[in-house]
Swiss-Prot record:
<protein>
    <recommendedName>
        <fullName>Small ribosomal subunit protein uS9</fullName>
    </recommendedName>
</protein>
<comment type="similarity">
    <text>Belongs to the universal ribosomal protein uS9 family.</text>
</comment>
<dbReference type="Pfam" id="PF00380">
    <property type="entry name" value="Ribosomal_S9"/>
</dbReference>
<dbReference type="InterPro" id="IPR023035">
    <property type="entry name" value="Ribosomal_uS9_bac/plastid"/>
</dbReference>
<dbReference type="GO" id="GO:0005737">
    <property type="term" value="C:cytoplasm"/>
</dbReference>
<dbReference type="GO" id="GO:0015935">
    <property type="term" value="C:small ribosomal subunit"/>
</dbReference>
<dbReference type="GO" id="GO:0003723">
    <property type="term" value="F:RNA binding"/>
</dbReference>
<dbReference type="InterPro" id="IPR020574">
    <property type="entry name" value="Ribosomal_uS9_CS"/>
</dbReference>
<dbReference type="GO" id="GO:0006412">
    <property type="term" value="P:translation"/>
</dbReference>
<dbReference type="GO" id="GO:0003735">
    <property type="term" value="F:structural constituent of ribosome"/>
</dbReference>
<keyword id="KW-0687">Ribonucleoprotein</keyword>
<dbReference type="InterPro" id="IPR014721">
    <property type="entry name" value="Ribsml_uS5_D2-typ_fold_subgr"/>
</dbReference>
<dbReference type="InterPro" id="IPR020568">
    <property type="entry name" value="Ribosomal_Su5_D2-typ_SF"/>
</dbReference>
<dbReference type="InterPro" id="IPR000754">
    <property type="entry name" value="Ribosomal_uS9"/>
</dbReference>
<keyword id="KW-0689">Ribosomal protein</keyword>
C-alpha cells in the first residue's frame, strides 16, 4: 500500500507556522499496479452488500441486501408475516431465483404507502436494483432481460369532473 506523509499545523500559535509531528499512515486505496489478493477480496464471486429503491403505484420500498442466509425483514417482520399470500412471496423472490442466488443474501426493507400488490412490486424492483448494484457485470443483463430493472409506471387514473369515475360517464337518456 502507499505511504503518505501529512503535516498538520498546531493550533494556538499565531503568526508562526509551527507544524506538529509528521504522521505517516498507510492508504487503504491501492496505488496503480499494486493490487493484492486482499484488495480484490470480495470483488469476484463473494456476495456484496448493496441498497436499492423501488416504487410501484403509491408504494415505496427501501431495500438493503447483505450477505447472509436468506432471511427477510420487512418493516421488522418476516416475509411470510408481511406477505401471507404465496403469489406476493414468489413475486418478491423472483430476482433471486433468476440469478440463482437463493439463500445468499439477507434482505432488510422498509415499505410505505400503497396496498399489498403495489408493495410487493416495489419490493421486487428494490431487490432487483440492489442485486444489480451488488454485481453489475454479472447480474445486469439477466435482470434486464427478465424485466426486473424496469419501473412499472402504471398508476390509478384520476377521476374527472362530470364523470362517475375516471372514464365512466353518467347514463345518457336520449328522451
Amino acid at each position: 500500500m502507499a505511504e503518505t506523509t501529512v503535516e498538520t499545523p498546531v493550533e494556538g500559535t499565531e503568526g508562526e507556522e509551527t507544524f506538529a509531528e509528521v504522521t505517516t499512515f498507510e492508504s487503504e486505496v491501492p496505488v496503480e499496479g499494486e493490487y493484492t489478493s486482499e484488495s480484490l477480496a470480495g470483488r469476484f464471486g463473494d456476495p456484496q452488500p448493496a441498497a436499492g429503491l423501488g416504487r410501484r403505484k403509491n408504494a415505496i420500498a427501501r431495500v438493503r441486501i447483505v450477505p447472509g442466509t436468506g432471511k427477510w425483514k420487512i418493516n421488522g417482520r418476516t416475509l411470510e408475516d408481511y406477505f401471507p399470500n404465496k403469489v406476493h412471496q414468489q413475486e418478491v423472490n423472483e430476482p433471486f431465483k433468476v440469478l440463482e442466488l437463493d439463500g445468499r443474501y439477507d434482505v432488510i426493507a422498509r415499505i410505505s404507502g400503497g396496498g399489498v400488490s403495489g408493495q410487493a412490486g416495489a419490493l421486487r424492483l428494490g431487490v432487483a436494483r440492489s442485486l444489480n448494484e451488488a454485481d453489475v457485470d454479472n447480474n445486469r443483463a439477466t435482470l434486464k432481460k427478465a424485466g426486473f430493472l424496469s419501473r412499472d409506471d402504471r398508476a390509478v387514473e384520476r377521476k374527472k369532473a362530470g364523470l362517475k369515475k375516471a372514464r365512466k360517464a353518467p347514463q345518457y337518456s336520449k328522451r
